[in-house]
Amino acid sequence: MQLPFPLAEEPDAAAMETGRKLFAGQSEFLKGVVAMSGLPPADRIEVCFAGRSNVGKSSLINALTGTKGLARASNTPGRTQEINFFTQGPELYLVDLPGYGYANAPLAVVEKWQRLLKQYLSGRQTLRRAFVLIDTRHGVKKVDEEIMKLLDTSAVTFQVVMTKADKVKEKDRAKILDQVRDALSKHPAAYPEIVLTSSEKGDGIATLRSIIAHLD
């Protein structure tokens, strides 16, 4: 019997090549957005990346695009309150949502960002999938549950990407995956497959590229 939320398998050669070609194109930072009025034209499909601060979001985007330093990490949780848009060739926007984990952010800033996030998620017709990044060392935390609930209510399909998988021994990883699967079973918008990655080692990057390349 197959587990609910199985790990994504490595794509076949043709699917992997489609992903490679998409991400072989030029990757560039387009703009940071602080209000809906600043969004770029909805003229191509887009995927967004959400995750708590220090989950490895910038590293993952840099690994996907093969462009070191394209997405820059902030060491202060909640500091960057912009939605950052990157172009991936002429076909795709990669959208970096601000890291959540608000211990050091003023309440007014948090509320403003949450409003913008809700508006973006519910109002962006070209958004094909959200990727929610979960640190393999820690599993799903309360703040992750909050973003998943928001994606449920916004009717945006989201897929969990486990980061830093190389930092966890295989026996411990199985326990964490059980916890993640249990959490995902409560979310109707969760895509029924998990991607295991390590930006440092390159594990799972080709798989994620292929998944993105086959969204339409």
Curated annotation (Swiss-Prot):
Binding site for GTP: 51-58, 78-82, 96-99, 163-166, 197-199
All residue ranges annotated as the EngB-type G domain in the record: 43-216
Pfam families in the record: MMR_HSR1
Binding site for Mg(2+): 58, 80
Database matches in HAMAP family: GTPase_EngB
Gene Ontology annotations of biological process type: division septum assembly
Cofactor(s) recorded in Swiss-Prot or TrEMBL: Mg(2+)
GO CC, any one term: cytosol
Gene3D superfamilies the UniProt entry points to: P-loop containing nucleotide triphosphate hydrolases (3.40.50.300)
Gene Ontology molecular-function annotations: GTP binding; metal ion binding
Family the entry assigns: Belongs to the TRAFAC class TrmE-Era-EngA-EngB-Septin-like GTPase superfamily. EngB GTPase family.
Keyword vocabulary terms for this entry: Cell cycle, Cell division, GTP-binding, Magnesium, Metal-binding, Nucleotide-binding, Septation
Purpose: Necessary for normal cell division and for the maintenance of normal septation.
Domain of life: Bacteria
Protein name in UniProt: Probable GTP-binding protein EngB
